[in-house]
Amino acid sequence: MDPKTSVVLPALHLVDPQIQLTTTRMEDAVVHGQNNADLKVYPIILRLGSQLSLSMVRRNLDSLEVRVFQSTPIVVKMTKLATTEELPDEFVVVTAK
């Protein structure tokens, strides 16, 4: 994992245990998404207590590192209010665990 990317803090509860979330700044996320096909970048807006589904915008089916999620959305739920430091620019990078 890129040392510039920080692991997600407990503000997020991941429903699917096979998915791992990391947070990064928007500029870094875009660069990672272009340079590493294993990373999926999603803009998200989190609201306390709400659930949101993140659809896969692209899949790299040739990579053995990437789990194929088929039609099941990735569901993330806020469990506490997050600061901008915890969720910089409200972007997350979703990678296969």
Curated annotation (Swiss-Prot):
One of its GO terms (cellular component) is host cell cytoplasmic vesicle membrane. Signal peptide: none annotated. Residues 8-97 form the 9b domain. It is a peripheral membrane protein. The keyword Protein biosynthesis does not apply. It is found in: Host cytoplasmic vesicle membrane; Host cytoplasm. Its main location: host cell. Keywords: Host cytoplasm, Host cytoplasmic vesicle, Host membrane, Membrane. It comes from the Viruses. Belongs to the coronavirus group 2 protein 9b family. This is Protein 9b.
